[in-house]
Amino acid sequence: MGTAVPGCPSSVARLSVSVRSRGEFMLVVMKAQATEEQVRAVCQKIEKLGYRSHAMPGAQRTAIGVTGNKGEVEQGTLEEMPGVQEVIKVSKPYKLVSRDLKEDNTVIRFPGTSATIGGRGLAIVAGPCAIESREQAFAVAERVHHAGAQFFRGGAYKPRTSPYSFQGMGEEGLKIMAEIRQQYGMKIITEAIDNESLDLVEEYADMVQIGARNMQNFSLLKRAGRGKKPVLLKRGMSATLEEFLMAAEYILSEGNYNVALCERGVRTFADHTRNTLDLSLVPAVQRLSHLPIFVDPSHGTGKRNKVTPLSRAAVAVGADGLMVEVHNKPDEALSDGPQSLFPDQFDELMTQVRQIAAVVGRTVPEIGVRETVGASQ
């Protein structure tokens, strides 16, 4: 990670600084032997030009993306500075999420726990579509925790197609999930559907989910970018890969770099499943971006008997995590019952996922109650 340099977000021996030149995004790569003073001078120069810096630490270098272009900058302005090795043009429309800026995979860490997203360990998120009652939530939490999930999902706010459908328990649901974190040690991931709900979700959850319907809610994306909680961004039902990455760019451009993506199926002509799960997106994202990517086979298929097979496939193709809906009584669920697994089915899914994870060089780390001390609120 390196030692922070005053006047610059962070630094190491080899540093990249990015800046937009004549409408284009540039990377300024420092020489390996560049001093902290030289790094600081480049950062200060960029700040004087009216840009905003975004530190992207990596194993071999730290990249500082610069946004907020207020005018043209001649490439030579930075090339001639002491310690600068080269200036590289980035042509992609998305900048901060691009591997051109950060070569290493982003790993999201959570205070007070060993749980991570994006590392060698496979992140497992499980729980009901919606928090319906304290009894229901704890019944599911006990089972998914025992099976090995590190993260608990549950909707306190539910964006529904019909205004007459169950809309969630709101803050009361968030309080129940906070109790579950305390009891079982699982980190909490739940959806914010607008700026108002995001304020409350940030108070209770460890990670904020932005759902498919809000993937291009740019006001909400920017608000999440100004927050301090990691964000799980789901792909829109008809979004292209570039549109998906550009949505993530909105969040990073506001200063929140702890973002994970989630493929949850797209709308096609097929009618044998609720959506068509696009597993080809996983390697495509990993080639273009440093952000971790989940797969949600529950929404991706909409059918219980398809969830486990597609979970196996997602792990095999290289997904960094799974998001699976589990309900103690799916036939009585207030939402998404047909795609929710019974707890026994989730147990079997985890057994199979561990086997496949080992084949592709991944593990499924455990998380316990002992790790709840110091967990961020």
What is each model feature region?
Residues G2-A4, P9, R14-L15:
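Intrinsic, low-complexity polybasic segments
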Residues Q167-I189, A224-P230, L279-I293, Q339-G361:
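Alpha-helix-loop-beta-strand connector modules within alpha/beta enzyme cores
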Residues G227-V326:
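Catalytic alpha/beta core domains of metabolic enzymes, predominantly
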Residues R153-E171, N328-S340:
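Glycine-rich, proline-tolerant flexible connector loops at the mouths of alpha/beta enzymes
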Residues K31, M169, M186-E196, D206-F218, ...:
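Catalytic beta/alpha-barrel core
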Residues L122-A139, S162-Q167, K187-E191, A212, ...:
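Active-site mouth loops of central-metabolism enzymes
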Residues V17-I124, I367, T372-S376:
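Non-catalytic terminal accessory/regulatory regions of metabolic enzymes
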Residues L101-D104, S162-K175, E196-S197, A212-K228, ...:
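Active-site-adjacent beta->alpha loops and helix N-cap segments on the catalytic face
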